[in-house]
Amino acid sequence: MRKTLGDMPTDASSSPAELKAVATAGAAVPVSILMPIKNEEGNLPRALGSVAWADEIFVVDSGSTDGSGEVAKAFDAQVVQFKMQGTWPKKKNWALQNLRFKHEWVFIMDADEVLPPEAEEEFRQIVSGEPNDVVGYLINRRFMFMGVWLKHAYYPNWNLRLFKHRLGRYEKLTDSATGSGDNEVHEHVIVEGETGRLKCEMDHFAFPSIEVFVEKHNRYSNWEACVAMDRFTAGNIGVSKWMDRLAVACKDPLSLRVKMGIRRQLKHWSVALPCRPFLRFLYVDLWQRGFLDGEPGFYFARLHGFYEFLCVAKTKELKRRFKAAAKNDEDA
C-alpha cells in the first residue's frame, strides 16, 4: 500500500527517506499521476512527496543524466523513457496514448509543482464519488518568485490537469514550431465533456532563480519566433478571417476550448502592436496588479517585458534571414 504524506517538509532538498518518515499509512487514492521530466533530481522529492497518496505514478523521462530515475523509483513511481520521433506526438500526448493507466482519472503535474495536503481528500471524493457529467477539473496555480508567492501577478492561473484520460488530449498547435522541446508547454488539454474547478491550489516553483527564468524564456522566445515565422511565411491571414474564425468558435461561449481560442486570437493580434515589451510590462504590473507584490512583482513584470523583447527581436532576425535567402535564390 502506498504511503500518504501528511505534513511534509517543503524543502526540495529533502530525501525520499525523510519525506516518507513523516508519512502515515492510508488507503491510496485511485488516481494515476503523470509527470514528465528531464534532469529534475532536485525537484522530484518535493513533487512526488506531495502526491505520495496516489495509487499509481508514472514518471516519463526524456533521457535524464542526473539521478532523477533513482529518486522516482524511491517513491514507487514507474519510470518510462521517452524519445521524441520527429515533432509529434510530444511527451504528454504520447503518454496519454501509450501508457496503460490503472485508473480512469489522471492528474498531470510538472516536477516543479507541489500539491497541498488537502488535495488528497478532494481527489478521493472526485474519483470515488457518484458519476456525473464532469470529465475534467482545472486547478489554480500559485507562482513562486524570488522566494514569495505572487498573489497578483499571474494569479489566478487556471490549468486543466485532472481528467478522464480517455477523454482528454493536448492540442496540437503547429508542426513547424518545436522550440519548446519535446514536451507540451504552450498547449492546453482539450476534454470531451464538462469541466469543473478544484478547491485546492498548486504551488508552482517554475522560477527558483532569475537565472532559471531567463534560461526558460530564452527557449520559449525561440518557440514564439518560430510560430510567428510560420504565420509570416504562410501569408497574411488578415483580421477579417480571424474574426470569422472567432465567430465560429463563439457558438459555444461557455466551452473551455472557446475561452482558450479567444485568448489565443487576442495574442495573435497583439503580436502586431507597437511597443510590445512595454505593453507586456504594463499588463503584468498594472492590469494583473503585479505592483501589489512589491519588488518581486516589479521584477517579474520587467522580465516579462524583456521576454517580449526577445520574441520581437528573434522574429525580426528570422524574417531578415528569410528575405535574404529568398533574394539569393532570385539572384542565383
Residue spans of the language-model regions?
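A conserved acidic beta->alpha catalytic loop
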Residues: S50, D61-V71, M84, D110
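Cell-envelope/extracellular polymer assembly enzymes that use nucleotide-activated donors
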Residues: P30-S32
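Short, structured coil segments at secondary-structure junctions
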Residues: W53, A74-D76, W158, V191
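Short, acidic/glycine-rich phosphate-metal binding loop used to engage nucleotide
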Residues: Q81-W88
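Acidic helix N-cap motif at the loop->helix transition within catalytic regions
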Residues: P45, D66-F75, E118
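Catalytic-site signature of metal-activated, phosphate-bearing donor transferases
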Residues: G6, P89-K90, L96, P116-F322, ...
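Active-site nucleotide-sugar/metal-binding loop of Leloir-type enzymes
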Residues: A74, N93-W105
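Short, well-formed alpha-helical segments that are part of the catalytic scaffolds
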Residues: P16, M35-E56
